[in-house]
Amino acid sequence: MKNMLSAFCLAGTALLCSCILPCEAAAAETAQTIKMNMKARIPALDKLKAQGAIGEANTGLLAVLKDPLSAEDAKTVDAENADRTKIYTAIAKQQGTTVKLVGERRARQIHELAPKGTFLQDEKGNWNRK
């Protein structure tokens, strides 16, 4: 299941980057960079999720559940959230909706595919382990 979620995230990122972000040369390079960076972060993020240090928030972003994270781990989480926000912003612009709504939709997808043991935030803000 963990590999399925990772594969889903990669496939979703690839689709979002290739279809939603503008196709100009600079934007395409940025989309490719985002995709590569997100792929590279998967092992570190999976480890932090398995430890219960981070969870998937109802906003479509990661949340720190156990402070303090190491500086390196905090940087990884911040970078992932920044890239997710860029993708959600591009989708919102393309669909004429809000970044918040795109993130919430993505959170529901992530929650469905998250492996057992992942901390997930429900719509009311409560944290539960799947």
Task: State each model region's role.
Residues 1-12:
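Bacterial N-terminal signal peptides that target proteins for export
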Residues 12-13, 118:
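Alpha-helical transmembrane segments and their juxtamembrane interfaces
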Residues 15-25:
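C-terminal segment of classical bacterial N-terminal signal peptides
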Residues 28-75, 79-82, 93-130:
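Amphipathic, charged alpha-helical segments and their helix-to-coil junctions
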Residues 88-89:
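Contiguous, amphipathic alpha-helical segments that mediate oligomerization or scaffolding
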